[in-house]
């Protein structure tokens, strides 16, 4: 979900230039049969993590200064049969784990992540470029996601079926259980490299499945460290395998007949390709959005400005529910615009490890360059630049536009960058019409003190979630998360992902 909506297009995510200050400490070199797959204390043996190959390792660089952080071994697509054999064993082991054991593993991993909070946060900063403040919040969300998954493992086991509600079935009784699907392929993006992995692994483990995980090649170390915590908490090693590679590997991982579900978070082009290649499988797709926030004349003004600034520029705008289009009622437009621009100019962009940095780098210099090009295209089409559009390598300063033509690509496609567009509207009907304009829709927000207006907007805006008196980017990890229209298939949120990753089995006893 970078400029032009290519967040996890597989060809793009292999090659961007990356970096940070100093490499994370490395372990001593292991013997050839136990080569490290990661950096620092993230190393695992190939038998436990993935297959050793002769392919060139995948280098991982910091988005801030391009320095080398380490590398991961590439997985050869030709090894898919061996990978599947491991996953097959993992699925059998996982389905036979008692629910209390699945729950204790997830709870134990949550405690480990929490106790190693600073180490996890620093890895997120180094490989993803989030500010240290934002990285700490992601770690806390990961802990919560794992705890919610542990609770789901214990309570969502099925229901009694009232067979005697049907004439002629008075002597029948029974229930349905929620059984595992089996093998799930999970593909995760770079923008939330820890918590979005937890959102796939946690419910899958709770449901008794095995997972073939492919994290973004740009941010693999958060995922590796999380898998390490799960195994340390008692998860059998075969239950999760991690692979690193490109389009050919992903195609092999999703096309295999034994894979029963593909869970993907990323770009539209890749999502379409996956849906064509997957065949008869369950699909869970979170393909992004183009979030509108409506600001009404009667809103709490300071709260609206603060919420919209945060919603637009959190994580350098690399947030699928971040505010991209802020629609302001006409009487308030000039005042809001001036206050919003003034607040935006106060944001500090720079080194993400500094506590006072508000906006870190984008994931790569190439992505920042594409963002700059998209903004310049909008300006050429008639948009007015209010601030920003200044790039230093991968650091793209917060950018605000007004007067963006509604036919412009920037208006219709997901920006996935620290870029926001302001536009006035007269009536609520017009604001809702503008909010619903793009094809992509995850979240929206509205600021108003009129409950009837808020509920009218919530009813008519075509999105998966409407945040009232909040920016569009609010998310609680237990709620259903997904979009309307073209933007997604299925829902994340622990309970809802768990239900997607399990299948009902009916047991009926005839006592007659």
Curated annotation (Swiss-Prot):
One of its GO terms (molecular function) is lactaldehyde dehydrogenase (NAD+) activity. The keyword Transmembrane helix does not apply. It is an enzyme of class 1 (oxidoreductase). The active site is at residues 286, 320. Pfam families: Aldedh (PF00171). It comes from the Bacteria. It comes from Sinorhizobium fredii (strain NBRC 101917 / NGR234). NADP(+) binds at residues 266-271. This is Putative aldehyde-dehydrogenase-like protein y4uC. The keyword Zinc does not apply.
